[in-house]
Amino acid sequence: MKLTLVQIFFMMLLLLLGLGVGLGVGLQMAAAVLEESDQLLDEFLSSDSQDKAEATKEGLASRSTETLLVSNKEVVQPEDTIISEDEVGGDRMLRAEVLLHSNKDYLRSDVMDRECNALMALKVKSKDHTCIPQYIFIHEELDAVKAVCKSPAVACDLKGGKCHKSPRPFDLTFCKLSKSGQVIPHCNYVTFILEKYILMSCSDMKVQITS
C-alpha cells in the first residue's frame, strides 16, 4: 500500500497535534506542582516565624523570672529606693569589715556577689544564737581605708573614742536583718548597695554612715 503525500502530511499533522496536547497537559501538571510547592513553602515560613515569636516571648518571660528572683533575694539598688539614715545605721556605730579582693574582683559589678545573705553566712554569729542585726562591708582598697585613720579626728557616737571621716564616699554594702528576733540559721538580710561617707573608729573598726 502506497501512501500519497496528502496522507503523509495528514499523519504528520495528527502526530504534531498529539505532541502538543501532551506537552500542554505536562505543563499544566508542572504548574500545579509548583503552585503546591509555593503553598508548602509559605506555610513553612509562616510556621517558622510563629515559632520565633513564641521563642522570643519565652525568652522575655525567662528574663522577667530572673529579675523576680533577684527581687526575692532582696537586693536593693540605691537609685531604686529612698533610704533614710535610720535604715542604714543612723547615728549608730556598726561593726564593719574591709573585703580584700584582687583588682579584678574589686572591679566586678555583679550585684549578686554582694548579696548580704551570702556575705553574712561567713560571719561569726552572736553567742546567744541571735542573728547580727546590721553589718557593713567596705569595698575599697585596704590602703584607702587605712588612710582614713590619718585624717583629723571628729566627733562620733563612740564614748571615749575618736573617729575619722573618709575623704570621699566609699563603696559600701549595708546588710540589715529583715525582721528582728531571727535566730541562727534563719538569718534573712536585706541588701543595700551605697556610696556614702563613713566615720570610722580605727581602734575597733566600727563604722557610722554619714553624709
UniProtKB/Swiss-Prot annotation:
<dbReference type="GO" id="GO:0050830">
    <property type="term" value="P:defense response to Gram-positive bacterium"/>
</dbReference>
<dbReference type="GO" id="GO:0005576">
    <property type="term" value="C:extracellular region"/>
</dbReference>
<keyword id="KW-0130">Cell adhesion</keyword>
<keyword id="KW-0964">Secreted</keyword>
<dbReference type="Pfam" id="PF00074">
    <property type="entry name" value="RnaseA"/>
</dbReference>
<protein>
    <recommendedName>
        <fullName>Inactive ribonuclease-like protein 10</fullName>
    </recommendedName>
</protein>
<keyword id="KW-0732">Signal</keyword>
<keyword id="KW-0278">Fertilization</keyword>
<dbReference type="InterPro" id="IPR001427">
    <property type="entry name" value="RNaseA"/>
</dbReference>
<dbReference type="GO" id="GO:1902093">
    <property type="term" value="P:positive regulation of flagellated sperm motility"/>
</dbReference>
<dbReference type="GO" id="GO:0007338">
    <property type="term" value="P:single fertilization"/>
</dbReference>
<comment type="similarity">
    <text>Belongs to the pancreatic ribonuclease family.</text>
</comment>
<dbReference type="GO" id="GO:0034113">
    <property type="term" value="P:heterotypic cell-cell adhesion"/>
</dbReference>
<comment type="function">
    <text>Secreted proximal epididymal protein required for post-testicular sperm maturation and male fertility. May be involved in sperm adhesion to the egg zona pellucida. Does not have ribonuclease activity.</text>
</comment>
<dbReference type="GO" id="GO:0080154">
    <property type="term" value="P:regulation of fertilization"/>
</dbReference>
<dbReference type="InterPro" id="IPR036816">
    <property type="entry name" value="RNaseA-like_dom_sf"/>
</dbReference>
<feature type="signal peptide">
    <location>
        <begin position="1"/>
        <end position="24"/>
    </location>
</feature>
<dbReference type="GO" id="GO:0022409">
    <property type="term" value="P:positive regulation of cell-cell adhesion"/>
</dbReference>
<dbReference type="InterPro" id="IPR023412">
    <property type="entry name" value="RNaseA_domain"/>
</dbReference>
<dbReference type="GO" id="GO:0003676">
    <property type="term" value="F:nucleic acid binding"/>
</dbReference>
<keyword id="KW-0325">Glycoprotein</keyword>
